[in-house]
Amino acid sequence: MSDWNPSLYLHFSAERSRPAVELLARVPLENVEYVADLGCGPGNSTALLHQRWPAARITGIDSSPAMIAEARSALPDCQFVEADIRNWQPEQALDLIFANASLQWLPDHYELFPHLVSLLNPQGVLAVQMPDNWLEPTHVLMREVAWEQNYPDRGREPLAGVHAYYDILSEAGCEVDIWRTTYYHQMPSHQAIIDWVTATGLRPWLQDLTESEQQLFLTRYHQMLEEQYPLQENGQILLAFPRLFIVARRTE
């Protein structure tokens, strides 16, 4: 897959950072020494962690060289490592693993989440936020356009679900706080919705298409978005964006 685009990702930085702020507010830790930010991207979530615990050793992990370069430039006091989350091993047990909008890209959560818990200190916390929009029109229409135009299914898998994550983490020895929130983002146009998802959810669908194929895909996608997202009285569009939050504290 082509590398991530930090500038495009940060175009909606306020909207993308808000869930990280709200997730961090629920982390029940006062003093921490070792923190990992999994899927740190350009460092917007890492900056929040550094603000709360300026003396902590914070390591951001991301598989994108471009994102890591952006994060290193923005936060010279933090450490950043280019690595696959599934294979990365910390040098010591962690007090907090923070994963804002990253783990949804990885498979096998029944194995991944217990593995992450095993990297925590006793009483350490795994804090996770994942977009839960697989059934939202933005993502349903990606699959429909791909089917119409005879492209393979390249989208991510749906999340396991609230009850499944509760059981996975409880069985891994955690106290679990889990909730789901739907944000309604005001978008000025249907093209703005495309701009949003092009930085994230649309990437796998477009990655292997030629420029002309991408244009055909996006033209049809735009048409279908217009059918599914009506304008408000003031001309804005409300984009519903559900997100799943988990704060799991290790007790065993």
Swiss-Prot record:
Organism name: Shigella flexneri
Pfam families for this protein: Methyltransf_25
Function statement: Catalyzes the S-adenosylmethionine monomethyl esterification of trans-aconitate.
Official protein name in the record: Trans-aconitate 2-methyltransferase
Record family assignment: Belongs to the methyltransferase superfamily. Tam family.
Keyword Hydrolase: no
Protein localization: Cytoplasm
Xref: SUPFAM superfamilies: S-adenosyl-L-methionine-dependent methyltransferases
Transmembrane segments: none
Main location as per UniProt: cytoplasm
Keywords annotated in UniProt: Cytoplasm, Methyltransferase, S-adenosyl-L-methionine, Transferase
EC annotation from Swiss-Prot or TrEMBL: 2.1.1.144
Keyword Transmembrane: no
GO molecular function, one term: trans-aconitate 2-methyltransferase activity
Protein's GO biological process: methylation
A Gene Ontology term for the protein's cellular component: cytoplasm
Substrates-to-products reaction catalysed: trans-aconitate + S-adenosyl-L-methionine = (E)-3-(methoxycarbonyl)pent-2-enedioate + S-adenosyl-L-homocysteine
